[in-house]
Design a protein with these regions (language model features):
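Carbohydrate-active catalytic/glycan-binding domains of CAZyme proteins
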Residues: 1-306
Length: 306
């Protein structure tokens, strides 16, 4: 979630959903959402938690997420763990920088763990590698430079690809980059920008899924406000020269509930296929809070530009 000027007082929390497909996600009967809030963060005075990504290693689930530090007003990357993927325990802050961090897109490649968090304030996309997974991370350098919100990296057809929003305060332009090697030369795709001037389908909203010949990207629908709901697009053709996508008929796949922890919006999903052929996803949601309530407890205000 991009560091933005204040205009609306929201609080973001993290939940767990499941379903028979990544387009059919819903609350699970044995999960009490939200599974993680700012009150669970014991090592940092947190305003909110958001942008969750999870990965399983050696039988344990690891959840990485943005923690907005109330004292510095900068994002840091937090960690929680779970044996089942349903019940989570906060662990610690695992990555801080002098600038704002969010959207900790974590992935495994060749037996090593990497992360491309949003490093917009540092004018680019940085790649981090775990030197001692899951708690120690080191920067390997920048993949691309410029205004890049919510960078989403994935492998397909022996290449690396990256979606990112280049208008982080308007949420209306989606760009696509491609590289032969992750630390190699990244070039903008000929079809990029994929989306321009449309707040409903430009800003990335979680892990890109590669399902055989079909690629699924989740996107924020920022109408009427930032982070209102999630849409899903299926990419049926992706080459070094061409790009074809269509919206999944189930869109929007996640929306505001109208009450509780996700009353006002949902803007993120990281979905994983489980052994029982069901999907498990970490998601986030927002609700408005009163400025008169105790900001040191569950009413810590988060300032997000609508």
């Amino acid at each position: 979630m991009t560091d933005q000027p204040p205009s609306k007082d929201l609080i973001w929390s993290i939940g767990i959903y499941g379903g028979k497909s990544p387009f059919d996600l819903h609350p699970l009967p044995d999960v009490s959402n939200p599974i993680l809030t700012c009150r669970d963060v014991t090592s940092t005075p947190a305003k909110f938690v958001a942008d969750p990504f999870m990965i399983q290693a050696d039988g344990t689930w690891y959840l990485f997420f943005e923690v907005l530090n109330q004292q510095t007003n900068k994002g840091e990357i937090g960690l929680a763990t779970s044996e089942t993927g349903h019940n989570w325990v906060y662990d610690q802050i695992v990555l801080t920088e002098p600038f704002h961090l969010s959207y900790p897109y974590v992935f495994e490649w060749n037996g090593e763990y990497y992360m491309t968090p949003e490093t917009l304030v540092a004018n680019g996309v940085r790649l981090y590698k775990a030197t001692d997974f899951p708690t120690q991370w080191s920067s390997l350098g920048s993949l691309i430079t410029g205004s890049c919100a919510d960078p989403s990296v994935f492998q397909y057809d022996d290449r690396w690809w990256m979606f990112t929003c280049s208008t982080p305060y308007q949420h209306d332009t989606l760009r696509l980059y491609v590289a032969d090697e992750i630390m190699g030369e990244w070039r903008e795709h000929p079809a990029s920008p994929i989306v321009e001037g449309n707040k409903r389908k430009a800003r990335p909203a979680g892990r890109v899924l590669v399902l055989g010949d079909t690629i699924v990207r989740f996107t924020q629908d920022c109408v009427p406000n930032y982070g209102t709901q999630l849409r899903a697009f299926e990419i049926s053709e992706l080459t070094s020269r061409t790009y074809v996508e269509k919206e999944n008929p189930s869109s929007p796949v996640l929306s505001a509930s109208g009450h509780g922890w996700n009353a006002l919006g949902m803007h993120h999903a990281d979905a994983h296929l489980m052994k029982d052929e069901q999907w498990l996803a970490c998601v986030d949601g927002s609700r408005e809070v009163s400025l008169q309530r105790d900001h040191n407890h569950d009413a810590r205000a988060a300032h997000i530009k609508a």
